[in-house]
Amino acid sequence: MKIALGIEYDGSRYFGWQRQDEVESVQQKLEEALSIVANAPIEVFCAGRTDSGVHGTGQVVHFETQAIRPLQSWCFGTNANLPDDIAVKWAVEVSEDFHARFSATARRYRYIIFNNKLRSAILPKGVSHYHYELDHQKMHEAGQFLLGENDFSSFRAAKCQSHTPWRNVHHLNVSRLGNYIVVDIQANAFVHHMVRNIVGSLIEVGQGRQPVEWIQWLLAQRDRTLAAPTAKAEGLYLVDVHYPERFGIPKTALGPLFLANN
């Protein structure tokens, strides 16, 4: 049978999602816990391979197993064998043609900036601190130039392995909740470091170092060296993955927790 899981994790102490030799990853911890429940080796496939230090509130994975377990056992049993910073949120049986990555039609990320002169001791690895005052309205206005299908070479990591830089951005919203600025972006898919590179350049606009139209110009140049530095991993969350309704993938609050109702 094939099972899909919803996964939440604090990526602060992990070297990204993907299993690697000699360092801890989220995938490694999840596979170890699932293998205990299944009493057999389990390999998982995820919707989006997040980088070192990046978090997830809406990650989706699937795995195949011959072990017959109640769905609640895949949740409670796995959580009992996971560290406190990784948790299974739900489990469903899915059809054989479901794939956590290739069946997805969109991914959604949120980047959280604590915009205050003094840093906060709360969630030091859960938000990115930026002490200069940022104009979130200008950041939002600039972000609208990125909507639709475009070549995102200017916001693509140098070592990106994707065959094409073209992606379709469905929405990009920048809002403020007190001292927190939230960059909310959804696209069919993302090139490597795309969200953090976009945020880095939007910060330049928000601080007033560049005009709103600079983002439009950057997009047209298709040159990563002209854009701002990559924003820190702290503050980035994979919050949602979209699938066709026929797969029956549950929808939960987007998160992170302190933004769950916004």
UniProtKB/Swiss-Prot annotation:
The lineage of its organism: Bacteria, Pseudomonadati, Pseudomonadota, Gammaproteobacteria, Pasteurellales. Its EC number is 5.4.99.12. This is tRNA pseudouridine synthase A. It catalyses: uridine(38/39/40) in tRNA = pseudouridine(38/39/40) in tRNA. Substrate binds at residue 109. Homodimer. Belongs to the tRNA pseudouridine synthase TruA family. GO terms for molecular function: RNA binding; tRNA pseudouridine(38-40) synthase activity. HAMAP family: TruA (MF_00171). GO terms for biological process: tRNA pseudouridine synthesis.
